[in-house]
């Protein structure tokens, strides 16, 4: 609770400060920003957009967002209370100590991601912790429907690796996952669901290599509610090898489902919040904007950070509407929210949907 109270206070203070300040810094290229310290990030942004993301919400943008979470969530006040080192949160340790942390089971595949981003970080002039969170925000700005995220600089880089066991796994049960988020930042069950909005623009690469880059929903390049709709559909078959721990049956050909997502979508503590994101895009954007900021401040003193949010591009608008994939109807839904009926949605016309893998950049 203390962390979230501090975050709320800092957010209000920043908003009040921004409203009262009329003078803005002018960067060497003529761009005006709220803080002069952020001018150097303009070149970093452009380098990432032009040479890594190609201004697209593709594989590299997805991985950049994944990296922000796997770095930041590795913090445990409960471990600290017992005299153990509990990790530093958003401190860049997953890149600084990549030889250790990318060997942790939940970080499988991130060794290649870290190395692909390392040259960008090295020429950016940014600290590693700041770079990881900034690159995730820049990449997500390419996703239609995403909110304009916040970007802050001034974090302290890690001096030791985070301990293993702090990143949730797809085979963990709901109680374990909720406890992990609560320990990391006093996040409750609803806020845990907010983190999973990131799965709207995501795919798996290494859980089942037989179907590498299989997305979690039918619109992986768009941050919309389809992930929340489609995870509530009845699974009918494994799209890959089958029998892999943490993998559930999928409702749509080509779509990958994590067991953890399936269970959280159906748990009575989280099901109604989950269902709400299927049709409420404004809420989805608002909650993800908040939780991304909160995540990026784990392990930091937010009062020491500099707001560089105005460096970030504005995401493209959403052009899709909530729907069932072709071949799916309301009869395929496994409703789990006792408070609100599952919404009535149109079904896409044509033959049954088959979802393509996310193209490799």
From Swiss-Prot:
It catalyses: 1-(3,4-dimethoxyphenyl)-2-(2-methoxyphenoxy)propane-1,3-diol + H2O2 = 3,4-dimethoxybenzaldehyde + guaiacol + glycolaldehyde + H2O; 2 (3,4-dimethoxyphenyl)methanol + H2O2 = 2 (3,4-dimethoxyphenyl)methanol radical + 2 H2O. This is Ligninase-3. It comes from Phlebia radiata. The record marks 66 as: Transition state stabilizer. Its EC number is 1.11.1.14. Gene3D superfamilies: 1.10.520.10, Peroxidase, domain 2. Ca(2+) 1 binds at residues 71, 89, 91, 93. Binds 2 calcium ions per subunit. Binds 1 heme b (iron(II)-protoporphyrin IX) group per subunit. GO terms for biological process: cellular response to oxidative stress; hydrogen peroxide catabolic process; lignin catabolic process; response to reactive oxygen species. PROSITE patterns: PEROXIDASE_2, PEROXIDASE_4.
């Amino acid at each position: 609770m203390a962390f979230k109270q501090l975050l709320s206070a800092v957010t209000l203070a920043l908003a009040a400060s921004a409203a009262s300040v009329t003078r803005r810094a002018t960067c060497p290229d003529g761009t005006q920003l709220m803080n002069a310290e952020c001018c150097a990030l303009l070149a970093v942004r452009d380098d990432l957009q032009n040479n890594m993301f190609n201004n697209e919400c593709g594989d590299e943008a997805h991985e950049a967002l994944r990296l922000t979470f796997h770095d930041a969530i590795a913090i445990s006040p409960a471990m600290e209370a017992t005299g153990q080192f509990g990790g530093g949160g958003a401190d860049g340790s997953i890149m600084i100590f990549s030889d250790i942390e990318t060997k942790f089971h939940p970080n499988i595949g991130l060794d290649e991601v870290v190395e692909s981003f390392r040259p960008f970080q090295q020429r950016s002039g940014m600290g590693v912790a700041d770079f990881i969170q900034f690159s995730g925000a820049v990449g997500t700005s390419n996703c239609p429907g995403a909110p304009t995220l916040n970007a802050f600089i001034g974090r302290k880089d890690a001096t030791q690796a985070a301990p293993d066991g702090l990143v949730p796994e797809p085979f963990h049960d709901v109680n374990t996952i909720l406890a992990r988020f609560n320990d990391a930042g006093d996040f409750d069950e609803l806020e845990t669901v907010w983190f999973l909005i990131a799965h709207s623009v995501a795919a798996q690469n290494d859980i089942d290599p037989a179907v590498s880059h299989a997305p979690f929903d039918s619109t992986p390049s768009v941050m919309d509610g389809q992930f929340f709709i489609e995870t509530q559909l009845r699974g009918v078959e494994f799209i890959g090898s089958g029998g892999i721990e943490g993998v559930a049956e999928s409702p749509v050909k080509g779509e990958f489902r994590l067991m953890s997502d399936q269970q959280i979508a159906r748990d009575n503590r989280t099901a109604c919040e989950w269902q709400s994101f299927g049709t409420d895009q404004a809420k989805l954007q608002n909650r993800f904007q908040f939780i991304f900021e909160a995540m990026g401040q784990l392990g930091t003193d937010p009062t020491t950070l500099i707001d560089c949010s105005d460096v970030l591009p504005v995401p493209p608008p959403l052009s899709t509407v909530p729907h069932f994939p072709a071949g799916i109807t309301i009869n395929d839904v496994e409703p789990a929210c006792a408070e609100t009926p599952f919404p009535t949605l149109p079904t896409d016309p044509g033959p049954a949907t088959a979802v393509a893998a996310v193209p490799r950049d």
